[in-house]
Amino acid sequence: MTKMHRYAAIAALAIFLSGCMAQRQPAPVEEVKPAPEQPAQPPQPPVVPSVPTIPQQPGPIEHEDQTGQPAPKVRHYDWNGAMQPLVSKMLQADGVTAGSVLLVDSVNNRTNGSLNANEATETLRNALANNGKFTLVSVQQLSMAKQQLGLSPQDSLGTRSKAIGIARNVGAQYVLYSSASGNVNAPALQMQLMLVQTGEIIWSGKGAVQQQ
């Protein structure tokens, strides 16, 4: 009987347990929802480093048009009017031997401005042409003598010593040294006749030069 009771108790327990399991509700299953998709981010362009600003370089210097400016004043002088009286006095000077060779140096500009010394020299040579007392050293001879000193034919010898030195080279007995000095608007013309052998000034004269 005891075994029967034991079997009965076990069977009852088994029935009870199966009933409890039948009454238990299954656990709710949560539906897994997929996460919302994030919109794709557009690719960012690469960052270009900023270039420092280069300061603007100054442009070329533009000079104003000089064509509209007036040309410098050209002075014209009455060289012949100033030289003729002086040449006449020189030809009458004492101690001058007729037929001698005379070297006429270029007129030296010693004024405070610019003047056409070549024009003055040409006028002086013309005033001495056919003078009847001197034979002039030719322009060609004088040019060759100046070139030997490294000077151009238009250059004045500048000093009396150079003029005397060249006069000896060309066989002249006299040198006529002339210069224009003072104010360029009213220069003074000075002439000196020198003896080549001694360098002595045997005559000198001075006159005013007027503008034309």
Swiss-Prot record:
Domain of life: Bacteria
GO molecular function terms listed in the Swiss-Prot or TrEMBL record: enzyme regulator activity
Subcellular location: Cell outer membrane
Keyword Signal: yes
Membrane-traversing stretches: none
Pro residues composition bias: residue spans: 36-49
Function: Regulator of peptidoglycan synthesis that is essential for the function of penicillin-binding protein 1B (PBP1b).
GO CC annotation, single: periplasmic side of cell outer membrane
Gene: lpoB
Protein topology in the membrane: Lipid-anchor
Region entry Disordered, spans: 28-73
Official protein name in the record: Penicillin-binding protein activator LpoB
Gene3D superfamilies, A to Z: ABC-type transport auxiliary lipoprotein component (3.40.50.10610)
Species name: Salmonella typhimurium (strain LT2 / SGSC1412 / ATCC 700720)
One Pfam family recorded for the sequence: LpoB
Lipid tethering residues (S-diacylglycerol cysteine): 20
